[in-house]
Amino acid sequence: CMNMAEGKVQDLRAVVDRTVKEVKITDVHTHLYPAEFGNMLLWGVDELLNYHYLIAETFRYANVDYDAFWKMTKKEQADLIWKTLFLENSPYSESCRGVLTVLNKLGLDPGSRDLDSYRKYFAGKTMEEYIDIVFETAGMKEVVMTNDPFDDQERPLWEKGVKRDGRFLAALRIDPLLIHWEKTWPRLKSWGYNVEQTLTEGTLAE
């Protein structure tokens, strides 16, 4: 009887493991964009390395001036981050492990520590191809974007009615309305909304 119970537990565990591996997920909070949004989608190993947590970690190790760092090109910044966190020190932080995990999942060799070879991999892919690879590798069905109507780079794309990859779902970012009303209400008014700085009933209704 005990063996039967153990067998059922093992069977259930196998079913759960298989289901988790096979199910397609929806990521409900991302800062990703479809290829139709052009340079708003940050991709490639240099962008991967220029993650703000990795930048902060680099400043703790590297003897580099803050202003000098931000005057570097993206490639130069990535070179410094890679050298500091992955070559001169053991990449043991969660952020560093995330980079190594991505490289491994893409079929690249993290152990080679060869940044140029990783760059060649991305250079050989189009943005659309890489998006497909990420969705397939991560088992994603769709992702929810974070869309800011007050972003002057993003808003014109929506106003143009750009056709986008259906796997990218829109979600309106309203932080500026709640936190920076003194700056956002004049913009809303210039776009034709009947609003005032004072939160009148009419403004709230609009």
Predicted regions and their residues:
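Metal-cofactor-binding active-site regions of metalloenzymes
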Residues: 2-26, 30-206
